[in-house]
C-alpha cells in the first residue's frame, strides 16, 4: 500500500531524524516527493509504502513527536 501525506515540521524538529526513526521502527519505505526546509519550518510531501497498520502506527508516531500530518488525496504534480 502507498499513501501520501503532507508533513509540516516545527523548528525544533527540522534537524531530527523523525522520518528515519519512523521508517525503521514500523518497517515503512519513505519516498520524499517534494520538500521545502527553512531555518524556521519544514514542509514535505511524503509517500509511505508498507502495511496499512504499519503506516497508521508510523503516522501516529510522528504526530506524537510534534509533526503536523495531513493525508494527500489524488495525484501530486511532479
Task: Show which residues each predicted segment covers.
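Long, contiguous binding/interaction regions
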Residues: 1-43, 47-78
Amino acid at each position: 500500500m502507498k499513501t501520501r501525506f503532507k508533513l509540516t515540521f516545527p523548528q525544533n524538529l527540522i534537524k531530527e531524524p523523525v522520518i528515519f526513526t519512523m521508517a525503521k521502527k514500523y518497517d515503512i519505505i519513505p519516498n520524499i516527493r517534494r520538500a521545502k526546509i527553512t531555518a524556521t519550518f519544514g514542509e514535505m510531501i511524503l509517500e509511505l509504502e508498507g502495511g496499512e497498520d504499519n503506516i497508521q502506527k508510523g503516522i501516529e508516531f510522528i504526530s506524537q513527536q510534534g509533526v503536523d500530518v495531513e493525508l494527500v488525496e489524488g495525484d501530486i504534480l511532479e
